[in-house]
Amino acid sequence: MPKRILQGVVVSDKMEKTVVVSVERRVMHPIYKKFIRRSKKYHAHDENNVFKTGETIRIRECAPISKTKCWEVIVEPQA
């Protein structure tokens, strides 16, 4: 089964080797048929503490690293 990949914004980088990423998705309201923005926060593994608050990054699902961490940051090569 392929690993899920999500894109979001770093909202906290205060922990060692961990960033908190807020991922936003759009869902349709069942009655009013209007699109609503929903967000969820994920703890992601950042091995070298490279990413800072406010940056847009991509995260990939991985094996559990700790109680709350089962995502890792995808480091994309600079173009």
UniProtKB/Swiss-Prot annotation:
Transmembrane segments: none annotated. Pfam families: Ribosomal_S17 (PF00366). One of its GO terms (molecular function) is rRNA binding. Gene3D superfamilies: Nucleic acid-binding proteins. Keywords: Ribonucleoprotein, Ribosomal protein, RNA-binding, rRNA-binding. The keyword Ribosomal protein applies. It comes from the Bacteria. GO terms for cellular component: cytosolic small ribosomal subunit. SUPFAM superfamilies: Nucleic acid-binding proteins. One of its GO terms (biological process) is translation. Part of the 30S ribosomal subunit. One of the primary rRNA binding proteins, it binds specifically to the 5'-end of 16S ribosomal RNA. PANTHER family: 40S RIBOSOMAL PROTEIN S11 FAMILY MEMBER (PTHR10744), SMALL RIBOSOMAL SUBUNIT PROTEIN US17M (PTHR10744:SF1). Belongs to the universal ribosomal protein uS17 family. This is Small ribosomal subunit protein uS17. It comes from Paramagnetospirillum magneticum (strain ATCC 700264 / AMB-1) (Magnetospirillum magneticum). The lineage of its organism: Bacteria, Pseudomonadati, Pseudomonadota, Alphaproteobacteria, Rhodospirillales. The gene is rpsQ.
